[in-house]
A protein has these predicted regions:
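Non-ligating segments of multi-cofactor redox enzymes
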Residues: 27-248
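Accessible peptide chain termini
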Residues: 1-2, 25-29
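Extreme N-terminal basic, low-complexity initiation segments
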Residues: 2-9
Length: 248
């Protein structure tokens, strides 16, 4: 009787495993495999760097891989539980689940922009990948998504893994910099600090609703931002998180 019950339990377990197999674990880290796994989950690998060898700080991670939103993010996120449950911070919650799963698969630990204080040094990490640069308006620009940067997390490795060499010039070098003149209230402009107060005040007006529904004018003006394939719905969600109290 006990053996029959055990066999039944084993059959149930095998059936459950077939329907919901555990994530594949990669004992030997492959950047290409990580890139593919991130893409399948709705993310892109935005850059990687050997941090410890650059800083000489023993407590720093040996390798950091930054993952963020790309063209496949919105269709996957918007149909996820987090994207539909109406609870606060849906993108952060989705990111921690997805990036956490990637970390389990590739034997990494994680860091998130929402962690803190103290906050992980995402800007420093990003600039060390040689795929992020400072734009004329002061915010970072990326080689494939322009000013539409949304880093969702970092995978941290305690050993140096093989990563692609990135020796790129800033996309701003040969650009006419429309980002510096597009903001209707000059909150983002060349050679000046970001005027956060002016930005938020504008978003409270009827004129500012195009930014709320489609995204920041300056970010959209960047020619490279087209590579992010942002939908208006995604931009609106990010803008609502940035400015939750719009009162046009």
């Amino acid at each position: 009787m006990r053996n029959a019950a055990q066999r039944q339990q084993n059959l149930w377990y095998c059936h459950a495993q077939a329907e919901h197999p555990p994530p594949t674990r990669h004992s030997a880290m492959s950047y290409r495999a990580l890139e593919k796994a991130a893409q399948n989950a709705g993310l892109i690998t935005m850059g990687a760097a050997h941090i410890q060898s650059q800083t000489g700080v023993a407590d720093d991670p040996a390798t950091v891989v930054l993952v963020g939103t790309g063209a496949d993010f919105w269709p996957i996120f918007s149909t996820s539980e987090e994207g539909q449950d109406g609870h606060p911070h849906p993108v952060d919650r989705w990111s921690k689940r997805i990036v956490g799963t990637l970390a389990d698969q590739f034997d990494a630990t994680t860091a998130y922009p929402s962690d803190g204080p103290p906050y992980p040094p995402f800007i420093s990490w990003a600039l060390k990948t040689n795929r992020f640069f400072l734009s004329p308006v002061g915010m970072m620009v990326h080689d494939t998504v322009g000013l539409m940067i949304s880093i969702r997390g970092a995978l941290l490795f305690d050993t140096e893994i093989a990563i692609p060499t990135a020796d790129l010039a800033s996309p701003c070098t040969a650009c006419k910099a429309p980002c510096t003149t597009t903001c209707p209230v000059g909150a983002l402009s060349a050679g000046a600090a970001y005027n956060v107060t002016a930005c938020h005040s504008y978003l409270d007006t009827s004129e500012g609703q195009s930014c709320m529904s489609q995204g920041c004018h300056a970010r959209r003006a960047c020619p490279v931002s087209a590579g992010a394939c942002r939908t208006d719905a995604q931009s609106a969600l990010h803008m609502k998180a940035f400015h939750p109290c719009a009162t046009p």
